Design a protein with these regions (language model features):
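GST-like fold's C-terminal all-alpha helical module
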Residues: 3-123
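C-terminal helix/juxtamembrane-tail motif
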Residues: 124-144
Length: 144
């Protein structure tokens, strides 16, 4: 379930936002996606719709994790999985990279501020020595 959520979030939220951020407004680029975020009303409506989708998706995951007795400190218990790392990557991309300031602006800050369980899991993943050494400041230095 958790890997699926991350894949869904990446495909339907992050990837279409990336098109907006990079200015890939040509139909060629948008046709490569599973959905065409800009087809129904341009950039502003696309951002509004993707913001709503982000909220719905993150609230669904937060509710599922908060109601799970096994989601501590990681999504499925005491061991960090690939899904935890994928979640960490998705969340930190939104929270720290320059381009996703578009989404942060829609929330007046952190788009995951109402998701304490997701935040806790990401903190745990980030505290893993190998993750911290590998990631360093890459998210905050990334322009997109």
């Amino acid at each position: 379930m958790y890997w699926s959520w991350c894949q869904d979030y990446y495909s339907f939220v992050l990837s279409p936002f990336h098109d907006i951020i990079t200015g890939h407004n040509e139909p060629f680029w948008r046709s490569l996606r599973l959905t065409d975020t800009l087809a129904e009303g341009g950039k502003e409506l696309g951002i509004k719709n993707l913001t709503t989708l982000h909220t719905n998706r993150s609230n669904m995951l937060e509710k599922n994790l908060a109601g799970s007795s096994s989601a501590k400190p990681f999504m499925t218990g005491s061991s960090c999985s690939y899904a935890d790392i994928f979640l960490y990557t998705c969340v930190r991309t939104v929270q720290e990279t320059g381009g996703f300031g578009i989404l942060r602006d829609e929330f007046g800050g952190d788009p995951f501020k109402d998701c304490p369980t997701i935040a806790s899991i990401c903190s745990e993943v980030g505290s893993i020595n190998e993750v911290g050494q590998t990631v360093g400041s890459k998210f905050s230095e990334c322009p997109i």
